[in-house]
Amino acid sequence: MESIFLHANITIIPHSVLYVSLSYYIINPCVSVSTNLDDYFSSFVSSSNTVYDNILVT
């Protein structure tokens, strides 16, 4: 019974490693695109924060 469990773990581990490396290669270009979006979004948020601050001040 233990040998079956061990064998299952041995077969699962390379699959998870493969999945992680694949998802890394898929996600990595998306991340580089989203960093630009993130910069845009953060500048948008900071500008909206200043508007909000101005409303608070008045």
UniProtKB/Swiss-Prot annotation:
Keyword tags = Membrane, Transmembrane, Transmembrane helix
Q: Where in the cell is it found?
A: Membrane
Kindly give the membrane topology term recorded for this protein: Single-pass membrane protein
Bilayer-crossing regions: 5-27
Question: Can you list the GO cellular component terms from the UniProt entry?
Answer: membrane
The name of this protein is Putative uncharacterized protein YDR034C-A
Native organism is Saccharomyces cerevisiae (strain ATCC 204508 / S288c) (Baker's yeast)
Q: What are the leading ranks of the lineage?
A: Eukaryota, Fungi, Dikarya, Ascomycota, Saccharomycotina
